[in-house]
């Protein structure tokens, strides 16, 4: 019964996530970009890679965020058809960050599976 409850909860979370990203594909992207700008104000170069269908809307928002945050470096925004809608890659000279929903979902599935397996091995119902 517990396994089924966990499966239902994960399925609901996936569905909700998909619906939210479909409704607001730039929501998480602009949040992540804003966080990067707050920590990388003096970075000389920042590259944001996004889905090509979101390019125009994202470009305007990201450029506005750069100005508001005081970012003075070179900002490059690239449209990439291989990046899923709602995902992005942000890169700078010393690092970067990736928002990739498929990888997040895979990690969640792995962790839930491990948790349930450990409960089964411990003899819990």
Language-model regions, residue ranges each:
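Elongated, mostly alpha-helical coiled-coil "stalk/stator" tethers of large membrane protein machines
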Residues: 1-125
């Amino acid at each position: 019964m517990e396994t089924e409850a966990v499966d239902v909860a994960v399925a609901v979370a996936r569905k909700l996530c998909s619906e939210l990203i479909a409704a607001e594909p730039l929501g998480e992207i602009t949040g992540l970009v804003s966080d990067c700008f707050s920590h990388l104000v003096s970075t000389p170069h920042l590259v944001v890679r996004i889905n090509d269908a979101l390019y125009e809307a994202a470009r305007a928002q990201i450029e506005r965020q750069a100005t508001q945050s005081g970012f003075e470096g070179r900002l490059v925004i690239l449209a990439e058809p291989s990046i899923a809608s709602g995902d992005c890659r942000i890169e700078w000279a010393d690092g970067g960050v990736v928002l990739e929903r498929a990888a997040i979902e895979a990690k969640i599935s792995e962790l839930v599976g491990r948790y349930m397996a450990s409960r089964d091995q411990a003899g819990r119902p």
